[in-house]
């Protein structure tokens, strides 16, 4: 099962903007889920993380109803969604519910992700909506977490900003090459065209997602 988590700096966009992700993966044999989440400033980033945890629990428990395998859940996220994908990979699922597997998420891929929240706390145009505290930054930054067991693939476009390029390398440095065996910069892709490539069979990001799904 593929769960795709959209971006938008935790404060904009909607699952309806990202339905284009599904057809190519369905054609390859995957069941696809594109969940929504509430947006800042109406809720906090921490609340969004908890919403996504609840969404993944639901996916795990209902996967077979949609032809999916609850033991083969892959999460892919873009931008803020990549942050959420990394948070879900790091989740201690047995503390969420005793009947859940330790590795509910079997693998994840972050596209143009944000893994250290401190620079965002210091950006006034974002902090107005995100309202991050120093303590929240520590709780919400995957780059500060112990490396998870399952694999994480990190991708960014060569034509993205230096900060997105830095974050992509940061998660490899933090979690190491065993956990992050793929850390790549894709030529000819910016923050938006790299996402479109996820839905394009033959594109690197699409092929890597299929690998995580066990379909390549």
Give each language-model segment a name:
Residues 1-216:
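Alpha/beta-hydrolase superfamily serine-hydrolase fold, recognizing
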């Amino acid at each position: 099962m593929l769960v795709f988590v959209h971006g938008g700096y935790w404060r904009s966009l909607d699952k309806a903007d990202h339905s284009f992700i599904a057809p190519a993966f369905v054609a390859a044999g995957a069941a696809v889920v594109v969940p929504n989440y509430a947006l800042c400033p109406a809720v906090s980033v921490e609340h969004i993380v908890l919403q996504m945890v609840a969404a993944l629990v639901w996916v795990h428990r209902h996967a077979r109803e949609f032809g999916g395998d609850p033991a083969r859940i892959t999460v892919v996220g873009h931008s803020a969604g990549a942050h959420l994908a990394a948070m879900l990979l790091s989740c201690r699922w047995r503390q969420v519910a005793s009947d859940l597997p330790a590795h509910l998420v079997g693998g994840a891929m972050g596209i143009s992700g944000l893994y250290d929240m401190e620079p965002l706390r210091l950006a006034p145009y974002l902090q107005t909506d995100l309202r991050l505290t120093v303590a929240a930054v520590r709780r919400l930054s995957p780059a500060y977490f112990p490396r998870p067991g399952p694999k994480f693939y990190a991708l960014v476009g060569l034509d993205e900003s230096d900060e997105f390029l830095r974050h992509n390398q940061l998660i490899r440095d933090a979690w190491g090459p065993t956990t992050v065996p793929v850390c790549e910069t894709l030529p000819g892709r910016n923050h938006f065209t790299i996402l479109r490539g996820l839905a394009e069979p033959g594109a690197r990001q699409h092929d890597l997602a299929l690998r995580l799904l066990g379909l390549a």
